[in-house]
C-alpha cells in the first residue's frame, strides 16, 4: 500500500483546519499520515491536530506563507527520519475544499500509480481560469 504524508498549513483558523483534517481522517486514514504546521497561530487558535507550532517572533508577526510553511513541515519529517515512510507528499492549506463523501488521497494515489511519469499533482478546478494555462495536449485530471 502506498502511504502519503499530508501537511496542512494553518494560521489562526482552527475550526477550518479541524474540519479538513477530520475529512481526511474519515475517508483516507489508511492512506495518509496528517501533520499540521501552525504558522504563527495564537495559542488560543491552534488546531486540535497541531503537530508543529512555529511561534518565533518573526513568524507570529508575518506568518510563514505557503512555501516556507511547507518546507518547514517537510524538513521536520526529514529530521525525524520519517521521510522514507512515504511514497508521496500532499501539501495543502487549511482552506482547501474536498468533494463531499469521497476519498481524496486514495484517488490521487491511484492517479500516480496509473501514470508512472506523473511527478506533481496540483489543484486546479474546472472553474478556475488557471486551467486555460495548462494547454490542450497536457495531462489533466479533475476530481
Could you describe each region identified by the protein language model?
Residues 22-32:
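Short, acidic, metal-binding catalytic loop of nucleotide-sugar glycosyltransferases
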Residues 1-22:
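N-proximal low-complexity "stem/linker" segments adjacent to membrane-targeting elements
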Residues 84-97:
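Short beta-strand-to-loop acidic/aromatic patch adjacent to the donor-nucleotide binding site
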Residues 36-46, 97:
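A conserved acidic beta->alpha catalytic loop
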Residues 48-60, 137-141:
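Active-site regions of enzymes building and remodeling cell-envelope glycoconjugates
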Residues 60-80:
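Glycine-rich, basic loop-to-helix element that forms the pyrophosphate-binding segment
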Residues 100-120:
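Conserved donor-nucleotide/metal-binding helix-loop-beta segment in metal-dependent transferases, i.e.
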Residues 119-135:
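Short beta-strand-to-loop element that shapes/binds the nucleotide-sugar donor at the catalytic cleft/hinge
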Amino acid at each position: 500500500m502506498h502511504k502519503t504524508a499530508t501537511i496542512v498549513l494553518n494560521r489562526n483558523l482552527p475550526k477550518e483546519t479541524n474540519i479538513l483534517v477530520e475529512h481526511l481522517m474519515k475517508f483516507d486514514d489508511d492512506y495518509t499520515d496528517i501533520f499540521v504546521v501552525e504558522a504563527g497561530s495564537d495559542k488560543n487558535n491552534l488546531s486540535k491536530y497541531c503537530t508543529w507550532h512555529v511561534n518565533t517572533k518573526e513568524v507570529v508577526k508575518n506568518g510563514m506563507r505557503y512555501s516556507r510553511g511547507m518546507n518547514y513541515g517537510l524538513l521536520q519529517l526529514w529530521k525525524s527520519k520519517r521521510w522514507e515512510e512515504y511514497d508521496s507528499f500532499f501539501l495543502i492549506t487549511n482552506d482547501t475544499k474536498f468533494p463531499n463523501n469521497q476519498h481524496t488521497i486514495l484517488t490521487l494515489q491511484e492517479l500516480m500509480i496509473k501514470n508512472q511519469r506523473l511527478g506533481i499533482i496540483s489543484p486546479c478546478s474546472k472553474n478556475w481560469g488557471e486551467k486555460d494555462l495548462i494547454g490542450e495536449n497536457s495531462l489533466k485530471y479533475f476530481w
